Design a protein with these regions (language model features):
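Conserved short alpha-helical segments that host acidic/polar catalytic motifs at enzyme active sites
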Residues: 1-134
């Protein structure tokens, strides 16, 4: 497969930016929904945008059920809100006075980093973190 810009994150619907860290069977995602590339992450992003980022948890549960080996760490942000999932891969958060960091893994030795358990949805808005099970 040739290297192409449309296959690289972040993907956007004009409002949200989205990245996917992991792997998923394209057949488990469903139709391409107008994806600009055939790579799994582009098809997954298109499915999420069609389903609505507000429904990210349900979309991840459906795809995870269809592909038990999927790794679906997704990060979506629109400038006001950040939504992330951990499904089969690591995710950590760091809450600080000047903001919240969400990352695949801690980037330093700060003891304030918190590892998020698998199969969780994380929402960050106005400096507040909410975590719910998937």
């Amino acid at each position: 497969m040739p290297i192409e810009e449309t296959a690289a994150a972040p993907f956007t619907d004009g409002t949200w930016l989205l990245s996917h860290n992991g792997i998923v069977d394209r057949g488990a995602v469903g139709e391409a929904f107008g994806a600009e590339s055939v790579v799994d992450s582009a098809i997954l992003a298109a499915r999420i945008f069609v389903s609505g980022v507000q429904n990210l948890g349900e979309t991840v549960r459906q795809i995870g059920a269809a592909d038990p080996g999927a790794r679906l760490n997704i990060l979506a942000a629109n400038g006001n809100e950040l939504v992330a999932t951990t499904w089969g891969d690591t995710l950590s958060i760091l809450e600080a006075a000047d903001g919240v960091v969400v990352a695949s893994e801690p980037y330093d030795d700060d003891p304030s980093w918190v590892d998020i358990p698998d199969r969780r949805l994380v929402r960050v808005r106005d400096g507040k973190v909410e975590i719910e099970g998937l």
